[in-house]
Amino acid sequence: MAKATTIKIKLLSTADTGFFYVTKKNSRTMTDKMTKRKYDPIARKHVEFKETKIK
């Protein structure tokens, strides 16, 4: 059986609120760490989210 190309990652807020999103990414085409600008409902504004491992 082949190895899966998509892996689950956690996008953690840089506003230090502890809020995170869980998403998937293709590990073969996107080898660097993912960053996205998304909405943080605890901070009530759009902030940068950085990729961390799911524990």
UniProtKB/Swiss-Prot annotation:
Q: What sections of the sequence does the record tag as coiled-coil?
A: none
Has the keyword Ribosomal protein been applied to this entry?
yes
One GO BP annotation is: translation
Q: Which InterPro entries match?
A: Ribosomal_bL33, Ribosomal_bL33_CS, Ribosomal_bL33_sf, Ribosomal_zn-bd
Q: Which GO terms describe its molecular function?
A: structural constituent of ribosome
Task: List the record's Gene Ontology CC terms alphabetically.
Answer: cytosolic large ribosomal subunit
Q: Does the keyword Transmembrane apply?
A: no
Family of the protein in this entry? Belongs to the bacterial ribosomal protein bL33 family.
Q: What is this protein called?
A: Large ribosomal subunit protein bL33
Q: What lineage is on file?
A: Bacteria, Pseudomonadati, Pseudomonadota, Alphaproteobacteria, Hyphomicrobiales
